[in-house]
Amino acid sequence: MINKKIITTKNISKVIKDKYILKDISFDISEGECVALIGPNGAGKTTLMNCLLGAKFITSGDIKVNDLKPTDRTLKNYVNVLSQENAVPERLKVSELITFVQKIYEDHLNNQEIDNILRFDDKQKDTLASKLSGGQRRLLSFALTLIGKPKIIFLDEPTAGMDTSTRIRFWEIVNKLKNNGLTIIYSSHYIEEVEHTADRILVLHKGELIRDTTPHAMRAEEVEKFFTLPLQYLEVLKDNENVYNLEVKHDSFNFLTKKPEEIWTLLQAAGCTLKDLEIQNRTLLDSVFATTKEN
């Protein structure tokens, strides 16, 4: 059975001060899919999420969420978002905050369902939400996002500030939500969170959608070679057509190539030996996350 398209975008662009923040992006997301948005800082991930949520307007193109414009008020309880910032009140205890949010929704998670997500003890529930650790606040914010039983959730860098054990717990919850048919769109700086959780990957770079693929397909793509060399060999390669993403550092430079044999022939002719260079394999997925970490 083919699932219904729950989000559709057609040629959407967003321009600010004559600069494209998003440029001519089109994709669909089906009901129940788990989709990862990846790309370097400044690629447009958060802006795209905000446009899908109706929090920011697009300059051109069209977005539909459940066949409605993202600003339609009937989507209020249908969609929710975990933003990058943990916005928790200063003076409410965890238990008080949960009760407050439950009262917003006619149909909401009960206390036992929330306990199953948080696994907080009585002392933690009696603590001011603002006094929790960063990872606990993040998990609490996530639970608050789910209280109204949304059908679509957006998670913007969801595990930021979490320790390893909390992060593992978080993705256990996400996988259960996937199995229950929730549609999930998230961004991440962790490669393992994309490989093990996402059904699809949307790769953004400088506001453009450069790839719509799956973790398996992306891993199977052609492998590039990542070279690191001393600066003395820069003149040999700096204008070579098979060298790209060249970056010069204090005492070395690095680059990517799909023609390592040709590059090695040139380097040998210039007196380079194996001890002078370092070579690593990189798929596109590796390259995206390496760029993200550097930024």
Features from the language model and the residues they span:
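Conserved ABC ATPase signature
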Residues: 128-132
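Short, charged/small-residue-rich alpha-helical element at the C-terminal edge
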Residues: 224-295
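Catalytic Walker B motif of ABC-type/P-loop ATPase nucleotide-binding domains
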Residues: 153-157
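ABC transporter nucleotide-binding domain
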Residues: 171-254
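The feature captures the beta-strand-to-loop junction immediately N-terminal to the Walker
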Residues: 38-40
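Conserved ABC transporter NBD signature motif
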Residues: 54, 60-77
